Amino acid sequence: MQSTLSQSPGSRFSQYMALTKPRVTQLAVFCAVIGMFLATPGMVPWHVLIGGTIGIWLLAGAAFAINCLVEQKIDAMMRRTAWRPSARGEITTPQILLFSAVLGSVGAWTLYTFTNPLTMWLTIATFVGYAVVYTLLLKPMTPQNIVIGGASGAMPPALGWAAVTGAVPGDAWILVLIIFVWTPPHFWVLALYRRKDYENAGLPMLPVTHGEKFTRLHILLYTVILFAVTLMPFISGMSGVVYLASAVLLGAVFLAYAWKIYRDYSDELARKAFRYSIVYLSLLFAALLVDHYARPLLGV
């Protein structure tokens, strides 16, 4: 009975969807869409909004599918990822490669057709940065994998901005910098309470190579830097007081988590901090959007 169910169309679709890491993709695409809206004082043209969103989503999914393929043996050794269809051998290597190729090709065509060549090439470069540079080279070789590899994961706002304007100005790079600095503490709190998983899989995550205390200190330091970086949209004039108030409040909570982790660590606290870090980034970018359209009305 179970074998029959696993081959049903709905189940097969779910297996392929799992390869795209939907929750991670959703956050990345959300940040890209915010970048689109911040790039213009008015509304984003519908063909750009829809085409850009779909294209970025497809190429992100293609990159995550390659990641699942490369790490299928590693995923099988980790409780957090052992459920993935690639780790369980439910989808073959040729099937994953074909799936990724189709997603990537359709995504690139969509971006070229509905946005512009710059967006397509930047998104392809992001694909290569994540699927090849991070997954194949950085992650298995250095504890700084998240710091260096975070550059590709930080690109969505720039992709969205480029989709609308055909350029990536300084304000877009500020948004990229926010995600770039957010990435290490976000993943390091996960690595703290999943340390055994990473150790068993042979991955040189910071808690494995440098220990818990060193990692806790770096989480705190990066969170302090993140707090400062999130003030840059206000300082640059891109955003107003609505965003500033949101950034300070959200950042204060994140700092409180980082301080508690540094002073009195527990796995449960790290889990809460990890979940909050996702909420934090989502609300921070939502605040950018609200401020963008509320600012002219409020005159602040």
From Swiss-Prot:
Q: Indicate yes or no for the key word Endoplasmic reticulum.
A: no
Family affiliation: Belongs to the UbiA prenyltransferase family. Protoheme IX farnesyltransferase subfamily.
**Protein name as catalogued:** Protoheme IX farnesyltransferase
Q: What is its main location?
A: membrane
Please give the function described in this protein's UniProt entry.
Converts heme B (protoheme IX) to heme O by substitution of the vinyl group on carbon 2 of heme B porphyrin ring with a hydroxyethyl farnesyl side group.
Q: Fetch the Pfam families from UniProt.
A: UbiA
UniProt KW Membrane keyword? yes
Spell out the GO cellular component terms annotated for this protein, sorted alphabetically and separated by semicolons: plasma membrane
State which residue ranges cross the membrane. 24-44, 46-66, 94-114, 118-138, 146-166, 172-192, 224-244, 278-298
Give GO terms for biological process: heme O biosynthetic process
Q: What class of enzyme is it?
A: transferase
Name the InterPro entries for this protein: Protohaem_IX_farnesylTrfase, UbiA_prenyltransferase, UbiA_prenylTrfase_CS, UbiA_sf
Its EC number(s) = 2.5.1.141
Keywords of this protein's UniProt record, alphabetized? Cell inner membrane, Cell membrane, Heme biosynthesis, Membrane, Transferase, Transmembrane, Transmembrane helix
Instruction: Mention one GO molecular function.
Output: protoheme IX farnesyltransferase activity
